[in-house]
Amino acid sequence: MILSFVLGLFASIARSELSVPEAAAKMMSLYLLFAIGFKGGVAVAGHGIDGHLLAAMAGGIALSFLLPFLAFALLRMSTGLSALDAAAVAAHYGSISIVTFVTATSVLSAQGIASEGYMVAVAAAMEAPAIVSALWLVARSGAGVRMDARLWHEILLNGSIVLLVGAFLIGAVTGEAGMDRISAFVVAPFQGVLCLFLLDMGLVAGRGLRGARGVISLGAVVFGVVMPILGAVAGLAVALIIGLSPGGAALMMTLAASASYIAVPAAMRVALPEANPSISLTLSLGITFPFNLTVG
């Protein structure tokens, strides 16, 4: 799987004509979100809702809300970014990359390492709190923030969140009976689809790396590598406090280390239209995403 990403990354940097049609990439992302959400719901149906699930949700939400404050402080100290741009970037690093999460889940499964199925719900819960804390940081700096219905619509009804949570609920309601009916769809093709999707993400990340020159400083590049490490450490601390299994701890670390490039950019376009989106996307998709997939 990771080699598929590396292939796409190399092809993009080498300026190969290799490409994946946008419609195909969209379909693969929809499939992966549905499959991982459904399987997580089935796991919860067999496990039941208990204190561990609620504690994991609370820990994930706390991480998502607090990590932007650390990211904001590091960005202001190590880069020349304005408070507005630093807060926008910080929101990306408090939220999560669902693709990184799906990849980590697949890697654990391939190695026979079990993890808590409800971590899918934790992932969905960690999308929005970072946006709220980033907007608070901007408001504190005196800049204008748009907190209107359109913003909350972007935060709460983002397509990836709706599909992930919806599939999770379907899996939780139907349980093993539902899995028996569609296992040929959500289980067997998963690894192959993920490989093709990671190939496309490698192509996208390569384009981000090519465009990084002139957009971000050396300090920002260092931040893009250091911040996920600090996030992973924070995620491990929360996992140990909660008492997650080794697989669950690895997923919590993955969530805390990743950076959003889907849900948060859409919200930032509404809430902080003056912020420079190329900085956030170059860091999250061009630096942190390939670092997490190849090294992390």
Predicted segments, located by residue:
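Solvent-exposed, amphipathic alpha-helical segments
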Residues: 43, 205-208
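Membrane-interfacial loop-to-transmembrane alpha-helix junctions, especially the N-terminal start
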Residues: 25-28, 216, 220
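Alpha-helical transmembrane segments of multi-pass small-molecule/ion transporters
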Residues: 1-10, 22, 49-206, 213-217, ...
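N-terminal signal-anchor module of multipass membrane proteins
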Residues: 1-45
